[in-house]
Amino acid sequence: MLHIADTILTSRLLTGTGKFATPELMLAALEASGSQLVTMAMKRVDLNGGNDAILAPLRQLGIKLLPNTSGAKTADEAVFAARLAREALGTHWLKLEIHPDVKYLLPDPIETLKAAEQLVKEGFTVLPYCGADPVLCKRLEEVGCAAVMPLGAPIGSNQGLQTRDFLRIIIEQARIPVIVDAGIGAPSHAADALEMGADGVLVNTAIAVARDPVAMARAFRLAVNAGGLARQAGQGNKQFVASATSPLTGFLHQQTEGAER
């Protein structure tokens, strides 16, 4: 179970709507993923309330929408986009994204914290995309964010958990859910994040650009379930020396003694 604010989700896998070849393929992949919370950029939404090829089918699947402020370069732009999303979609949930750097899409920590504080005051349930900075994540928690979404690697890079050491600190210190966002390129990366103690992961590119997005979505679903179950089960401690699972010393001595007789 993933508990965010006043909502309990049975899936720890969050997904996105970008980069899919067709809306139909996107919907099939999202359904296969089992995800219950899907993020989407406001620029993809039909603000006139007409027949939206993406929005309406998502709602029919019972998926909770998480609009994001992708494209915002400042706190003011993000707050404006958030208000627009709440008006257009009727939700106070928001994935806060502010990345002025168009090459690496790295989040602006100063503007993100500023916007988060304002949006929380306005009643939004804020899930900020941020760098894997333990101090920043703690500050975002303190201003009232419902979860933090530190990056594993740059958006869409498929590099996996390049920020592993910092993610461990964030997870250890957090009193709100930690959802690893960006850079997860394989189901094994997702399982690794859950085994580490992350509460969830958000995956988009790795599913959308796969040769078979539906199969990849299913693979991520299984990986997230496996990683979460492994964490709950409790993994054995690492050690630098061997530890035999089936000691044979006594058996060999018995055989030797029998032969001597």
UniProtKB/Swiss-Prot annotation:
What is any one of the record's Gene Ontology cellular component terms? cytoplasm
Q: What does this protein do?
A: Catalyzes the rearrangement of 1-deoxy-D-xylulose 5-phosphate (DXP) to produce the thiazole phosphate moiety of thiamine. Sulfur is provided by the thiocarboxylate moiety of the carrier protein ThiS. In vitro, sulfur can be provided by H(2)S.
Q: How does it assemble?
A: Homotetramer. Forms heterodimers with either ThiH or ThiS.
Q: Name one Pfam family in it.
A: ThiG
The answer, when asked if rRNA-binding is one of the entry's keywords, is no
Specify the protein name. Thiazole synthase
Species name:
Pectobacterium atrosepticum (strain SCRI 1043 / ATCC BAA-672)
Question: Which residues does the Swiss-Prot or TrEMBL record annotate as the active site?
Answer: 95
Q: Which positions carry the signal peptide feature in this UniProt record?
A: none
InterPro entries for this protein: Aldolase_TIM, Thiazole_synthase_ThiG, ThiG
Pathways per UniProt: Cofactor biosynthesis; thiamine diphosphate biosynthesis
Tell me which residues bind 1-deoxy-D-xylulose 5-phosphate. Answer: 156, 182-183, 204-205
Indicate the family of this protein. Belongs to the ThiG family.
Q: Which GO terms describe its molecular function?
A: thiazole synthase activity
Reactions that this protein is recorded to catalyse: [ThiS sulfur-carrier protein]-C-terminal-Gly-aminoethanethioate + 2-iminoacetate + 1-deoxy-D-xylulose 5-phosphate = [ThiS sulfur-carrier protein]-C-terminal Gly-Gly + 2-[(2R,5Z)-2-carboxy-4-methylthiazol-5(2H)-ylidene]ethyl phosphate + 2 H2O + H(+)
Q: List the disulfide bonds.
A: none
Cell compartment(s), UniProt:
Cytoplasm
- Which keywords does this chain's UniProt record carry? Cytoplasm, Schiff base, Thiamine biosynthesis, Transferase
Top-tier EC class: transferase
Entries under HAMAP family matching the protein: ThiG
- E.C. no: 2.8.1.10
**Which Gene Ontology BP annotations are present?**
thiamine diphosphate biosynthetic process
